Design a protein with these regions (language model features):
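Alpha/beta enzyme core
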Residues: 48-82, 86, 90-150
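Glycine-rich, positively charged N-terminal anion/phosphate-binding segment
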Residues: 1-60
Length: 150
């Protein structure tokens, strides 16, 4: 059944979306024939920006689901404190998840994360607990560390 199908978009950056970057808005757009659940994979490091992007995605793009990406291992992303580096800072992770869940209202939010940065810094248990505590609908574990890449 189509109601059970979920296709998550490419990852978009909350800041670029809020700032109105055309390329990011194109990634977040859906065709008229795309009636299956509209799901966006969202990335960012600032709770307020992520909350604003969530509101805009729901109100302007008709998004039915937000998937937060805390698993990106790309050095450019993790070096700036994003992606797989966020769960290393559990208070920030909690603030981000809380702000997005609150902004999403009845729209479901899920989170994706890795085991950790490397085998000496595993964060997945805390990340899962934070997600559960903040009301995400589901968590997804990419069962590799950021150091293992893809």
């Amino acid at each position: 059944s189509q109601d059970r199908c979920l296709y998550v978009s490419e990852m978009i950056t909350a800041r670029a979306f809020v700032e109105g970057h055309a390329r990011t808005h194109k990634l977040a757009s859906f065709g008229a024939d795309e009636t299956t659940r509209r799901s966006i994979q969202l990335y960012g490091t600032h709770p307020d920006t992520l909350a604003a992007a969530t509101r805009l995605l729901i109100e302007e793009c008709g998004v039915h689901h937000i998937d937060m990406n805390f698993g990106c291992p790309v050095r450019k992303v993790t070096a700036s404190g994003g992606g797989a580096a966020i769960p290393v800072r559990p208070k920030l992770l909690q603030k981000i998840v809380r702000s997005v869940v609150k902004s999403a209202g009845s729209v479901p939010v899920t989170i994706k994360f890795r085991k950790g940065i490397d085998d000496s810094l595993l964060t997945f248990l805390d990340a899962g607990r934070i997600g559960e505590g903040e009301g995400v609908r589901a968590v997804a574990l990419h069962a590799r560390t950021a150091a293992q890449l893809y």
